Amino acid sequence: MPKRQAQRRFTRKTDSKTPSQPLVSRRSANYQPSLWQHEYLLSLGNTYVKEDNVERVTLLKQEVSKMLNETEGLLEQLELIDTLQRLGVSYHFEQEIKKTLTNVHVKNVRAHKNRIDRNRWGDLYATALEFRLLRQHGFSIAQDVFDGNIGVDLDDKDIKGILSLYEASYLSTRIDTKLKESIYYTTKRLRKFVEVNKNETKSYTLRRMVIHALEMPYHRRVGRLEARWYIEVYGERHDMNPILLELAKLDFNFVQAIHQDELKSLSSWWSKTGLTKHLDFVRDRITEGYFSSVGVMYEPEFAYHRQMLTKVFMLITTIDDIYDIYGTLEELQLFTTIVEKWDVNRLEELPNYMKLCFLCLVNEINQIGYFVLRDKGFNVIPYLKESWADMCTTFLKEAKWYKSGYKPNFEEYMQNGWISSSVPTILLHLFCLLSDQTLDILGSYNHSVVRSSATILRLANDLATSSEELARGDTMKSVQCHMHETGASEAESRAYIQGIIGVAWDDLNMEKKSCRLHQGFLEAAANLGRVAQCVYQYGDGHGCPDKAKTVNHVRSLLVHPLPLN
């Protein structure tokens, strides 16, 4: 794949309104150029998408649907659903899965009312699998199904059960104290299993699953990446079902071909905006932006949602770099005011680089507003405008903190930071497309779902990028704010931040089973948190994608198809 290795040159003077205007020194983040040239993206293709394969997929889907309807054992039904989810093809069978899990939930409720031991399976693995799948799909199930045997009494020999409990524990809420405690006990035993069996070939597949889970639990992983990984693992299992494996591979390649076409179109759009040409300090990350959109919603039916989401990601990246790196305080204050007023008539007051950015923003938001008005019958533009203005206001506050050397405490930082994370703006756009509910239900987007997702992204970003951003002279991030306020060490502050991320996930889990918002929106909000944990797991995957495994993720999802043999 072609790469440009040369460092980008950064403009060092403003776009002067008059020849006499003095030069202004600008900061530079020295972001690397895009690793994905437009011409290369246009060359992407998938040779596995053929007419006979399309017919084969139809037949395989019929076979799997038959399996779902005819599988009798309750544990076997749950295992089939779990396998379909992990392979990334469960979206084809939503009705069958909902029917099965509804029946499981009804039996669970009856057992509770009749005071029957709900740990009826006789083993930890099955109980934890049932718990995880029901919680994952929004059904109410209490932690007491485990009958208290989820702590020090765990059987070290039951690694399959311990792994199942470990995965289930990450669907806890704030009130599930026993379940949350089990994370410590299961993690300890799983790590011991990995160490003891490092040279044991008989336990290879299970050990691989355990290592993968310890790196990041299944509930917090990006579904599409997990499907790519699990298809390979599943193919090595002795109990593999060839029908499921073949469907997963064919479907992955078909969906990838759709994604490739969308990426080509978006790359052309990005090139035509001219933003990276005229604002050469901006991160050129259209491919990474689209990867994030796929992480939020990968299903073929959400093509327009991904297109809109990617454009929003790129506009946010551009504006963030203006505030974070390039703009003077005077320019940023003026830009914020004009965004607040949404006043195109004041365009001439802006320097040239800001004119292009603002006009591009206005055009894209108006287009989104047009489609929502056409398809749903209500005008969302005032809401969208307000969200961009609020985000820019938080960007401006952070710029002022930097210019003045002000050090906010942790609470003050987070009050500003959850909005500057851009998640409220992103999710508001998605809500407009996904739901027919009134926008007022979000409460000016200060809803627990939005706030929790924003907290995850804000803090995951901070944990990954703090050292780099501070090195170039940036505002203190959450880790440094906590250290400065409490006197804690960096390690202690990072552990504290990780704890807050965990609480945010607890709140998202609670909303999944109790919230009245559109279920697709709830899943998208959680997926945005998953994307954040993925992109920033090994470093700044947006600013330096080659150093944080983002490049590998892009290749596996958008470049390389799965071989069928």
UniProtKB/Swiss-Prot annotation:
Pfam families: Terpene_synth (PF01397), Terpene_synth_C (PF03936)
Binding locations of Mg(2+) 3: N461, T465, E469
This enzyme's EC code(s): 4.2.3.106, 4.2.3.46
Key words of the record: Chloroplast, Cytoplasm, Lyase, Magnesium, Manganese, Metal-binding, Plastid, Potassium, Transit peptide
Cofactor: Mg(2+); Mn(2+); K(+)
Outcome of gene disruption: Reduction of TMTT, MeSA and (E,E)-alpha-farnesene emmission. No formation of (E)-beta-ocimene detected.
Pathway where it operates: Secondary metabolite biosynthesis; terpenoid biosynthesis
Catalytic activity: (2E,6E)-farnesyl diphosphate = (3E,6E)-alpha-farnesene + diphosphate; (2E)-geranyl diphosphate = (E)-beta-ocimene + diphosphate
GO cellular component, one term: cytosol
Binding site for Mg(2+) 1: D320, D324
Tissue specificity annotation: Predominantly expressed in flowers but also in leaves, roots, stems and siliques.
Superkingdom per UniProt: Eukaryota
Cofactor note: Binds 3 Mg(2+) or Mn(2+) ions per subunit.
Biased composition (Basic residues): 1-11
Induction: By coronalon, jasmonic acid and wounding, but not by salicylic acid, cimene and limonene. Also induced in response to the caterpillar P.xylostella or P.rapae feeding.
Transit peptide: 1-25
MF annotations from Gene Ontology: (E)-beta-ocimene synthase activity; alpha-farnesene synthase activity; magnesium ion binding; myrcene synthase activity; terpene synthase activity; tricyclene synthase activity
Binding-site positions, (2E)-geranyl diphosphate: R283, D320, D324, R458, N461
GO biological process: diterpenoid biosynthetic process; response to herbivore; response to insect; response to jasmonic acid; response to wounding; sesquiterpenoid biosynthetic process
Motif DDXXD motif, residue range(s) on this chain: 320-324
Task of the protein: Predominantly involved in sesquiterpenes (C15) biosynthesis. Using FPP as substrate, the major product is (E,E)-alpha-farnesene with minor amounts of (Z,E)-alpha-farnesene and (E,E)-beta-farnesene. Using GPP as substrate, could also be able in vitro to synthesize monoterpene (C10) with (E)-beta-ocimene as the major product and with (Z)-beta-ocimene and myrcene as minor products.
Protein family per UniProt: Belongs to the terpene synthase family. Tpsb subfamily.
Comment field on protein domains: The Asp-Asp-Xaa-Xaa-Asp/Glu (DDXXD/E) motif is important for the catalytic activity, presumably through binding to Mg(2+).
PANTHER family: OS04G0344100 PROTEIN-RELATED, TERPENOID SYNTHASE 3, CHLOROPLASTIC
Designated name of the protein: Terpenoid synthase 3, chloroplastic
Natural source organism: Arabidopsis thaliana
Primary gene name: TPS03
